[in-house]
């Protein structure tokens, strides 16, 4: 009798677990199916995951296990290779897009799609009124604010500043009698560059203060859930964001005062331009909006340059024949310089054809930003599927760049794959695409090129752990920050 009762209790427990598990596992699907009604029949294939957390566990599991593509290849296996899938990720019902033509369509459709960052990013970055301005007003402000960093002519004025910081930083690294964390030092150097360009300041105290809080801020940008409680990365990031505002707002007041007293004397930064920009009603941006933009620019500007330049140098040193080819190109560029030319020039930058391929291949294989984010402002038809109004769209860079159908042997570092490669919209999207493509792409590539140029000409990387594993969160990086000796070439 006792044994029968035990089995009955066990059966009830197991049965209850199975029923509850099955119900909870399908709850999101049922909820959105009822909410959308007949439209749900036209959603792409996929899985809405668990209530609240959606599919964040398998998404981050791949990154933590060192196989970030596993999430996407699991979608391929379950739902076919169409490249458009429904999902629930970063707290929102979403459509994941990794078909190049579909990516191109979304990027170009600025009328039906707006920026659609996760809630954590929005709360950390956009605290002012810029996001509530009209779409036309946003376009105008964005165009005016980013004009100083678009195109070769505009970015040429920053070369001397970048070159000075690069040369001094590398001399300092090579002079140390112990190994350095190469990536960490690159981040410090690129932060100096971006702070100088955007804030118009080379003050070590200002740069140090901003960088101190920036790290915690950046770690919370893609928090799975925006939980503002002690112990969560998002909470720490919110506190860091508050401190960044407290540091930057006095800089705005100081720059405004310097302008009124005519004390800038050519030392203008992007911050000065932002203080002059007016919206469609003739209203100037509030300080909180300017701080929002400065933090966004600082984030995008220094992270991409530091990591991609570091990875490019690492990959080249892992492939001696590529390193030799890249170094020879830099030596030939120096030989061709006019006798009157001192230092790097925009013409040198234009001649760096192989380094441009190295940078593009590093962008492709590294995927510093895994996704571009949009939000549908109306029901949109995308290759026969519906994207419901209000749903997020993740244009999954990593899924495009690591798909063997788009790039044969995608895990191999091979700059030659860019030889005479035709421009195929939607296939290469490290900076996004369409009207909202990253405005700092030109400046970032210039900065990376100058770092790589001077490093290859004068230094050699000697990693202490050549087989060091890669960590993928929050961004791909060597787990030891590329602990290495920087050796000056004779």
Curated annotation (Swiss-Prot):
Keywords noted in UniProt: Heme, Iron, Membrane, Metal-binding, Oxidoreductase, Transmembrane, Transmembrane helix
Residue spans crossing the bilayer: 4-24
Enzyme class: oxidoreductase
Main localization of the protein described in the UniProt heading: membrane
Protein's cellular compartments: Membrane
Family statement drawn from the similarity comment of this UniProt entry: Belongs to the cytochrome P450 family.
Entry GO MF terms: ent-kaurenoic acid monooxygenase activity; heme binding; iron ion binding
UniProt keyword Transmembrane, yes or no: yes
Summary of the tissues where the protein is detected: Mainly expressed in petioles and, to a lower extent, in roots.
Cofactor dependence: heme
PANTHER family assigned: CYTOCHROME P450 26 (PTHR24286), CYTOCHROME P450 88D6 (PTHR24286:SF199)
Keyword Repressor: no
E.C. no: 1.14.14.-
Pathway: Secondary metabolite biosynthesis; terpenoid biosynthesis
Topology relative to the membrane: Single-pass membrane protein
Signal peptide interval: none
Reactions this protein catalyses: (21S)-21-acetoxyl-apo-melianone + reduced [NADPH--hemoprotein reductase] + O2 = (21S)-21-acetyl-1-hydroxy-apo-melianone + oxidized [NADPH--hemoprotein reductase] + H2O + H(+)
Source organism (scientific name): Melia azedarach
Identification of the protein by name: (21S)-21-acetyl-1-hydroxy-apo-melianone synthase CYP88A164
UniProt binding sites for heme: 438
Residue stretches in coiled coil: none
GO biological process: brassinosteroid biosynthetic process; brassinosteroid homeostasis; sterol metabolic process
């Amino acid at each position: 009798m006792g044994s029968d009762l035990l089995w009955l209790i066990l059966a009830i427990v197991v049965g209850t677990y199975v029923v509850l598990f099955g119900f909870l596992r399908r709850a999101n699907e049922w909820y959105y199916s009822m909410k959308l009604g007949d439209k749900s029949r036209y959603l792409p294939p996929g899985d809405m995951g668990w209530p609240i957390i959606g599919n964040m566990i398998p998404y981050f599991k791949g990154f933590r296990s060192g196989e970030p593509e596993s999430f996407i290849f699991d979608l391929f296996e379950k739902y076919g290779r169409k490249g458009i899938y429904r999902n629930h990720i970063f707290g929102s019902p979403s459509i994941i897009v990794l078909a190049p033509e579909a990516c191109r369509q979304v990027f170009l459709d600025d009328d039906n799609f707006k920026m659609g960052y996760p809630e954590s990013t929005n709360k950390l970055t956009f605290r002012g009124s810029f996001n509530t301005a009209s779409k036309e007003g946003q376009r105008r402000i964005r165009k005016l604010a980013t004009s100083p960093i678009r195109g070769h002519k505009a970015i040429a004025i920053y070369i001397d500043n970048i070159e000075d910081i690069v040369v001094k930083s590398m001399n300092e690294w090579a002079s140390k009698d112990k190994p350095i964390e190469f990536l960490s030092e690159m981040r410090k150097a690129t932060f100096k560059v971006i702070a100088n360009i955007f804030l118009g300041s080379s003050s070590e105290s200002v740069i140090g203060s901003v960088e101190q809080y920036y790290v915690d801020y950046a770690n919370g940008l893609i928090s799975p859930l925006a939980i503002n409680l002690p112990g969560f990365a998002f909470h720490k990031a919110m506190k860091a964001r508050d401190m960044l505002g407290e540091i930057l707002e006095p800089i705005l007041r100081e720059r405004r005062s310097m302008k009124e007293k005519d004390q800038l004397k050519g030392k203008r930064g992007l911050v000065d331009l932002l203080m002059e920009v007016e919206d469609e009603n003739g209203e100037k941006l509030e300080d909180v909006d300017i701080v929002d933009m400065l933090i966004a620019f600082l984030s995008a500007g220094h992270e991409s340059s530091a990591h991609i330049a570091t990875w490019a140098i690492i990959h080249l040193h892992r492939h001696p024949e590529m390193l030799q080819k890249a170094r020879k190109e830099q030596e030939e560029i120096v030989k061709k310089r006019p006798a009157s030319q001192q230092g790097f020039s925009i013409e040198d930058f234009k001649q760096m054809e192989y380094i441009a391929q190295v940078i593009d291949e590093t962008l492709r294989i590294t995927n510093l930003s895994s996704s571009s984010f949009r939000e549908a402002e109306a029901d949109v038809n995308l290759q026969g599927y519906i994207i419901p109004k209000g749903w997020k769209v993740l244009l999954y860079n990593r899924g495009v760049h690591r798909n063997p159908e788009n790039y044969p042997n995608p895990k191999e570092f091979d700059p030659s794959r860019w030889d005479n490669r035709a421009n195929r919209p939607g296939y290469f999207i490290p900076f996004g695409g369409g009207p909202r493509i990253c405005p700092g792409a030109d400046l970032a590539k210039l900065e990376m090129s100058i770092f790589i140029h001077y490093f290859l000409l004068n230094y050699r990387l000697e990693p202490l752990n050549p087989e060091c594993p890669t960590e993928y969160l929050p961004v791909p990086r060597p787990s030891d920050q590329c602990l290495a000796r920087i050796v000056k070439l004779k």
